[in-house]
A protein has these predicted regions:
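Active-site helix of classical SDR
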Residues: 123, 160, 168
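Alpha-helical segment proximal to the catalytic Tyr-Lys
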Residues: 128, 173-177, 264
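C-terminal substrate-recognition "lid" of short-chain dehydrogenase/reductases
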Residues: 4, 82, 120, 242-273, ...
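Canonical Rossmann dinucleotide-binding motif of NAD(H)/NADP(H)-dependent dehydrogenases/reductases
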Residues: 3-34
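Residue(s) in the substrate-gating loop at a strand-loop-helix junction
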Residues: 144
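Short, small/polar-rich loop/turn modules that mediate ligand/substrate recognition or access, typified
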Residues: 89, 176, 181, 266-268
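Substrate-binding pocket helix/loop in short-chain dehydrogenase/reductase
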Residues: 99-112, 236
């Protein structure tokens, strides 16, 4: 009883080197042919190369998810090339930003636009293609823990991820009559595990941001006397019951299963792979990581990356 996506064709939007690339790789490793979109053509091509060096089949379909003609264009390209589309992962998003006192209208507008039109236009045109061709497809929107609860310093992100969550439930109702499923997956600050990303940016996987871009949530970015801190900066208690919120590989396993026929009746739902982080009551502080048994070993997907890393050690 193996989960298999053999014969299925997937489109993953925003297939940048972290979560998008991880999901695209997972879909390929489970047998799907994958079309990797990104507004950054190099990011899309890099995701394709990662899939190919792991033995999968992929093409790059660069484009802006907010541009309807471009969405229709890359959908057509995928259909001409592979004859069908069974899976859509709406992953593209603008991360970061600032708090409500400091965010600019331009950033807020664009961040909301990428999430809103990205999810809408891709779900509309690819869902319509699936419906017209009798394909009982699976659509997965990538949300965030910030879509379910509040953090300081990410007001645009909180707004659009909250929107994504109910978009999924409504789109699930629209597409249920066609046998097409719509669900969300909620990442919770996974630890990057793409070897190329780590080689380029270090273990955290993020480029060091200038002070001015660090959230604007309190005294850190402003010297005004009225500013108050919004984030605890002292020693941190353990936050995650199982000690880790996992990696993009963990996300990929879950999304691949969600796109398989095993989940044929799952629609309008949200999934987390977060070591219990979201289930935790606010007043409960988990044990220290060193005292935990830890999760079962990760089943790796980037096999050549693992081998390369072992060889270079
Ligand atoms: N990294 C995290 O800790 C985290 C946590 C929770 C949720 N998420 C979500 O996971 C997803 C991926 O996050 P990530 O960490 O890999 O971020 P990322 O910034 O590395 O990837 C997002 C990609 O989307 C692309 N993109 C942006 N605008 C686009 C557009 N208009 N058209 C096409 N592509 C566009 C970017 O170029 C980028 O490659 C996002 O939806 C994000 O909100 C991430």
């Amino acid at each position: 009883m193996d989960v298999s996506l053999a014969g299925k064709v997937a489109i993953v939007t925003g297939a940048g080197p972290n979560i998008g690339s991880g999901i695209a790789l997972a879909l390929a490793k489970y047998g799907a042919t994958v079309a990797c979109n990104d507004i950054d053509a190099d990011a899309a091509k890099t995701a394709v190369k990662r899939i190919e060096r792991n033995g999968g089949t992929a093409i790059a379909i660069p484009g802006d998810v907010t541009d309807e003609e471009q969405v229709k264009g890359y959908l057509q390209e995928v259909v001409e090339r592979f004859g069908r589309v069974d899976i859509l992962v709406n992953n593209a998003a603008l991360l970061g930003g600032k708090g409500v006192l400091d965010e600019s209208a331009d950033f807020f507008r664009r961040a909301v636009e990428v999430a809103a039109l990205g999810n809408f236009l891709n779900t509309k045109h690819i869902g319509r293609y699936m419906a017209e061709h009798g394909i009982r497809g699976s659509i997965v929107a990538i949300s965030s823990s910030n879509g379910w609860s509040g953090s300081a310093g990410v007001i645009a992100y909180a707004f659009h991820k909250g929107g994504v969550n109910n978009f999924v439930r409504a789109a699930a109702m629209d597409l249920a009559p066609y046998g097409i499923r719509v669900n969300s997956f909620t990442p919770t600050a996974p630890t990057p595990d793409n070897p190329e990303l780590i080689a380029e940016r270090g273990a955290g996987g993020v480029l060091e941001r200038p002070q001015a871009f660090r959230h604007g949530i309190g005294g850190a970015t402003g010297t005004e006397s009225w500013r108050r801190p919004a984030r605890w900066t002292g020693e941190r208690m353990p936050l995650v019951p199982m000690g880790t919120t996992g990696t993009p590989t963990d996300i990929g396993h879950c999304v691949a299963w969600l796109c398989s026929d095993y989940s044929r009746l799952i629609t309008g739902c949200d999934f987390v792979v977060d070591g219990g982080a979201r289930a935790k009551n606010f007043a409960y502080a988990p044990a220290a990581v060193a005292d935990l048994a830890g999760p079962a070993p990760l089943v790796p997907l980037d096999v050549t990356g693992e081998l390369d890393r072992e060889l270079s050690m």
